[in-house]
């Protein structure tokens, strides 16, 4: 048995409230959890991860989030949200300068971090046969002991949608 093993207890509280029937809804959540950082998960996130990485766990000590959904009309929905996470031992990728092929692979380091995320999305949906959406996410990731969160995008923009062509034929895209 590992004498360093610790027991963790995490909150999970969620609240939703409709302010104006189906037009405006607000929501909030407080949670946390433990995330396994396996070699398989790290190479899926970054295929250039080197062979000598240390698997570990990221302790999401606290995750507070909230937002609102506004139905602008019967076919258009706008949603916005914000979150704050306090992470212990979050995994970050850095250039591996020790290998034979310097700077062509990445190694991992673990650092505590505070992460603030702001996001918004606009959705257009017509009678369950056509849907399109555009959204943006801004992330302020502040790891301890690192100049910045390397290889973690600060801004992400997504665009996508689907069309139901026939009963069992769906065309779907996400970028």
Model-identified regions with their sequence ranges:
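Exposed, low-structure sequence patches enriched in small/polar residues
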Residues: 6-10, 14-175
């Amino acid at each position: 048995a590992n004498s360093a093993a610790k027991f963790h207890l995490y909150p999970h509280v969620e609240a939703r409230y409709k302010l104006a029937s189906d037009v405006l809804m607000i929501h909030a959540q407080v949670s946390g959890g433990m995330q396994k950082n396996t070699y398989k998960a790290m190479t899926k996130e970054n295929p250039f991860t080197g062979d000598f990485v240390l698997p570990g766990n990221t302790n999401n000590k606290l995750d507070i989030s909230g937002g609102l959904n506004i139905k602008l009309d019967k076919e258009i929905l706008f949603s916005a949200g914000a979150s704050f996470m306090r992470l212990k031992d979050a995994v970050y990728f850095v250039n591996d300068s020790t290998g034979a092929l310097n700077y062509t692979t990445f190694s991992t380091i673990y650092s505590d971090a505070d992460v603030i995320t702001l996001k918004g999305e606009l959705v257009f949906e017509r009678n369950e046969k056509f849907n399109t959406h555009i959204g943006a996410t801004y992330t302020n990731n502040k790891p301890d002991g690192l100049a910045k969160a390397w290889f973690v995008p600060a801004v992400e923009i997504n665009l996508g949608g689907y069309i139901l062509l026939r009963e069992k034929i769906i065309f779907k895209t996400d970028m």
